[in-house]
Curated annotation (Swiss-Prot):
Binds to 23S rRNA. Forms part of two intersubunit bridges in the 70S ribosome. It comes from Endomicrobium trichonymphae. The gene is rplN. One of its GO terms (cellular component) is cytosolic large ribosomal subunit. Transmembrane segments: none annotated. It comes from the Bacteria. Keywords: Ribonucleoprotein, Ribosomal protein, RNA-binding, rRNA-binding. This is Large ribosomal subunit protein uL14.
């Protein structure tokens, strides 16, 4: 469950390392974001000479959460960290690589490009 002022890791090579959520645009009553939801965030930590700079406002989709989510078959899945992938206005990822596993719930939200770039889909 991601809410405002949550610090998240960035799981792509766009250049940002950490971002802070300041608005949940698609989520549970626009209060909490889970896997597959879109948030607006500001870059808190970035690599030098990267595509995004510290202080930039970006859109990101949540790909991993520490809070467990229940699947339709009754199983639960949770991850070790809260992570996002930075996207553009069309919903395509800005980076060309994804680091770490992502949840298969992203397929339901039509983030097929993120699924194809990820090394592991759980």
């Amino acid at each position: 469950m991601i809410q405002e002022r949550t610090i998240l890791n960035v799981a792509d090579n766009s250049g940002a390392r950490k971002i802070r959520c300041f608005r949940v645009t698609k989520g549970l009553k626009r209060r909490y974001a889970s896997i597959g939801d879109v948030i607006h965030a500001s870059v808190q930590d970035a690599l030098p000479h990267a595509n995004v700079k510290k202080g930039d406002v970006v859109k990101a989709v949540v790909v991993r959460t520490v809070k467990e989510i229940r699947r339709a078959d009754g199983t639960y899945i949770k991850f070790d960290d809260n992570a996002t992938v930075i996207i553009n206005d069309e919903g395509e990822p800005k980076g060309t690589r994804i680091f770490g596993p992502v949840a298969k719930e992203l397929r339901e939200n039509n983030y097929l490009k993120i699924i194809s770039l990820a090394p592991e889909v759980i």
